[in-house]
Regions:
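Non-catalytic DNA-recognition/assembly elements of restriction-modification systems
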Residues: 1-22, 179-185, 190
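Short, structured motif recognition centered on aromatic/hydrophobic residues
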Residues: 7, 12, 32, 65, ...
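Sequence-specific dsDNA recognition surfaces
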Residues: 13-24, 38-67
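A short beta-sheet element
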Residues: 36, 61-117
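A short glycine-rich beta-alpha junction/loop motif
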Residues: 91-98, 130-151
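Hydrophobic stripe of amphipathic alpha-helices that form coiled-coil interfaces
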Residues: 168, 172-175, 179, 183-193, ...
Length: 201
């Protein structure tokens, strides 16, 4: 059982650094997948089809993704949507995405991913968004979001539990919408319970 005194609240700006993506024209073929905001679905997953590509030139090598890199859409209807990159192929992230880098001795990427799907993240993000008709959640706004950070072993336990529910939700056939909805509600319930750490006075 995690003791509340072991949970620290930090702003994302205190524990992370954020990098905007590479600006280029997407192509139908190339040496790396070009991941755009339209490639992240409503559940924070990478859409497997409709891929676009670019050729990896020297100036875009620093935008190549590694496994467990986190990406967030910063503009448009999908602002705030966060995905975790878990593919084995080369990929570069586009300009309307922000890459989030956290010290892995403080924050496990998958723990953050689950947090970014939840109510606590969205309550804050929706207050920080700007831009009216074209919503923007830029890096400066993102830095202000507060996150509860339990010790790493507790983060690992939370991730293990939530991953099981997430896997169940996404492994069910598309032909069972009622079952999918029930699983999604179950995942959302446990996510909110497991991430509900009262703030220190």
């Amino acid at each position: 059982q995690c003791r509340l005194k072991d949970v620290v609240w930090k702003t994302l700006g205190e524990v992370g650094k954020f990098t905007y993506g590479y600006i280029a024209k997407a192509q139908d073929a190339g040496t790396a997948r070009f991941i755009r905001i339209s490639d992240i679905n409503a559940n924070g997953k990478l859409i497997p089809n409709g891929e676009k590509y670019i050729d990896v030139l020297p100036e875009c090598k620093k935008y190549l993704l590694k496994k467990n890199d986190l990406l967030m859409a910063r503009t448009g209807a999908t602002y705030g949507k966060t995905m975790i990159f878990s593919e084995d192929y080369p990929a570069v992230y586009a300009g309307f995405l922000i890459k989030l880098d956290f010290d892995k001795n403080i924050l496990i990427p998958k723990y953050y991913w689950h947090f970014a799907q939840g109510e606590l993240f969205w309550r804050q993000a929706n207050k920080l968004v700007s831009g009216g008709g074209q919503p923007q959640l830029n890096a400066n706004a993102l830095k202000m979001i507060k996150i509860p950070i339990p010790p790493l072993p507790e983060q690992e336990k939370i991730v293990a539990i939530l991953d099981k529910f997430d896997t169940l939700t996404n492994s069910i056939s598309e032909g069972l919408p009622h079952e999918i909805a029930l699983r999604r509600k179950q995942y959302e319930y446990y996510r909110e319970q497991l991430l509900a750490f009262p703030k220190a006075a």
